[in-house]
């Protein structure tokens, strides 16, 4: 049966949570294959808004088993805070499972993240300060602590000692901070062991057995294509691979088992933090999109930078990920705009580029070349089919589809899961 991947096609905050929630009632497993509690997503169910960070959006789907995959980095304190907050609102979190091979975010990762950003000053990346980058650094440097280590005190202590031997030198001699005590960290992790134990599984075996048994598995990528450490706007990226290929690595599901890759893309573009953004708006229209679209980060509350739809980025994202479908969100936010610019190419130092520029310098110099599409004033929030849309809104969707090189299978016309036009079924279509 199908393994489906959902990937953000821009710089995050595209509405992946809504897409996962929409499909959640039809899938058996929802897996988060990468990232940590640095990437928030919002899900609206029956008019109630849920802001999730570490947990997969599938946690709100009554039939799906949500799994935090081996490619994630897990802050245990944040995990249980989020679980408790959902329980307090009546949500069932009992089916949640966590991969034994997922890495852990330690308190010292958060300390290092914050002091490093302060040290960098104007050169800072704009991280969330939640220790995600340092945790991934330890993973790659083979200094990481995994979920399974919490249940073996001697291994846990050995790993904490190895990691802090280096970090304390840095904290004390470079950043003028106090050294972190090994036993303090060991006690911190051991304090979660009893509550964590029932959640831990071999997720690779579980998920592949599920596929063998005819179950449907949905992989919900965190962050987005242009935050990918390899394919994003480096160095203004995250520390993992939130592109489609990273979903295989972060879940243990082989690439040949993936049957569908769905790109989630806004009808305009947003970005949080530093980095190049060719279509960014610095005027009242940017403020309008920000206010109308509710463009403020789930995790940090930071206002998102807003700009027009970028078809160059959309085509490139489709190529990198092998998208079979696009799910377009927030079309309703554009209602009332008379003429809507769409970026179809870049001007880089006088040369037209219809593809993503090769170098970082070229992309920083890229200026958008726009085509202008007619807007609409009618309320589209109740539309159920493409034919329900006013002519100009329908034309906008069809033109973007043509420019982006991948079929548009679903269009969001409001925040609720039911405010979605489904053109092609995202599981069987």
Curated annotation (Swiss-Prot):
A single BP term in Gene Ontology: 'de novo' AMP biosynthetic process
Binding site for Mg(2+): 13, 40
Top-level taxonomic group: Bacteria
Keywords assigned by UniProt, alphabetized: Cytoplasm, GTP-binding, Ligase, Magnesium, Metal-binding, Nucleotide-binding, Purine biosynthesis
Pathway where this protein functions: Purine metabolism; AMP biosynthesis via de novo pathway; AMP from IMP: step 1/2
Localization terms from the record: Cytoplasm
Pfam family, one: Adenylsucc_synt
HAMAP family: Adenylosucc_synth
NCBIfam families reported for this sequence: PRK01117.1 (NF002223), purA (TIGR00184)
Name of the protein described by the UniProt record: Adenylosuccinate synthetase
Upper lineage: Bacteria, Bacillati, Actinomycetota, Actinomycetes, Micrococcales
């Amino acid at each position: 049966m199908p393994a489906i991947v959902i990937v953000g096609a821009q710089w995050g905050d595209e509405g992946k949570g809504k897409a996962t929630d929409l499909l959640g009632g039809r899938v058996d497993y929802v897996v988060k294959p990468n990232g940590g509690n640095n990437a928030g997503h919002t899900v609206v169910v029956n008019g109630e808004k849920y802001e999730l960070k570490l947990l997969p959006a599938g946690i709100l789907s009554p039939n799906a088993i949500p799994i935090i995959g081996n490619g994630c980095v897990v802050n245990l304190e944040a995990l249980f805070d989020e679980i408790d907050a959902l329980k307090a609102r009546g949500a069932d979190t009992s089916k949640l499972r966590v991969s034994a091979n997922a890495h852990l975010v330690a308190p010292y990762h958060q300390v290092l993240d914050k002091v490093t950003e302060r040290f960098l000053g104007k050169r800072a990346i704009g991280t969330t300060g939640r220790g995600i980058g340092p945790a991934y650094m330890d993973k790659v440097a083979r200094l990481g602590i995994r979920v399974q280590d919490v249940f073996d005190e001697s291994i846990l202590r050995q790993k904490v000692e190895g990691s802090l031997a280096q970090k304390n030198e840095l904290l004390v001699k470079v950043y003028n901070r106090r050294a972190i005590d090994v036993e303090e960290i060991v006690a911190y992790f051991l304090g979660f062991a009893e509550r964590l134990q029932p959640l831990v599984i071999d997720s690779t075996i579980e998920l592949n057995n599920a596929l063998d048994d005819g179950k449907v598995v949905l992989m919900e990528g965190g962050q987005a294509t242009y935050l990918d450490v390899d394919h994003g706007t480096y160095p203004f990226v995250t520390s993992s691979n939130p592109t489609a290929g990273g979903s295989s690595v972060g879940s243990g599901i082989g690439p040949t088992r993936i049957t569908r890759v769905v790109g989630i893309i806004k009808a305009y573009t947003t970005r949080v933090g530093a980095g190049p953004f060719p279509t960014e708006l610095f005027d009242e229209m940017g403020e309008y999109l920000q206010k109308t679209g509710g463009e403020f980060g789930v995790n940090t509350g930071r206002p998102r930078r807003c700009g027009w739809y970028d078809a160059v980025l959309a085509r490139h994202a489709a190529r990198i990920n092998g998208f079979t479908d696009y799910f377009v969100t927030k079309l309703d936010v554009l209602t009332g705009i008379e003429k809507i610019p769409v970026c179809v190419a870049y001007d880089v130092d006088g040369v037209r580029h219809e593809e993503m520029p090769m170098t970082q310098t070229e992309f920083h110099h890229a200026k958008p070349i726009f085509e202008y599409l007619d807007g609409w004033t009618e309320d589209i929030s109740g539309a159920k089919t493409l034919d329900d849309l006013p002519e100009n809104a329908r034309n906008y969707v069809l033109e973007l589809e043509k420019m982006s090189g991948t079929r548009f299978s679903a269009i969001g016309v409001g925040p609720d899961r039911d405010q979605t036009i489904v053109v092609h079924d995202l599981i069987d279509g």
